[in-house]
Amino acid sequence: MRILAVILALLLSAGSAIAVEKITPRQAHEAVGEGGLVLVDIRTPEEWAETGIPEPATPIDMTSADFVPKLKELLTGNPGRTVGFICRTGNRSNYLTEVLEKAGLTNIVDVTGGVAGNGKVTGWIAEGLPMKQHCETC
């Protein structure tokens, strides 16, 4: 993960640091529906196959070698929009958003509770939010 932090720090443009906002899966779903949020599922392909992917999240495996280029492409294609990151329980998305914030990225949110929930926050699935069961790009 340290390598990821260094790569992101070098590749992402600098900006003023702000605290990363945290939202629930339901809030993320509503923000996506209103057009104000682009949702990124940062779990692994194995996890995507097991549960499906939140609708309409873009799957980008945060452990893959092409994570940074794919994220940069997504950011470039969605200027001015907030990007929300979701994982299984909220741990990885919390870590990633902290790293991205330290690298200077703004307009990002952490979707707490993730897809499965974490005992404190109900996850995307338990909230009954829509899931794609088959991922053609995973």
Identify the residue ranges that each predicted region occupies.
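Short, surface-exposed ligand- or partner-binding patches at beta-edge/loop junctions that are enriched
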Residues: 86
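Structural scaffold elements adjacent to functional motifs in cytosolic proteins
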Residues: 39-41
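Bacterial N-terminal signal peptides
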Residues: 2-15
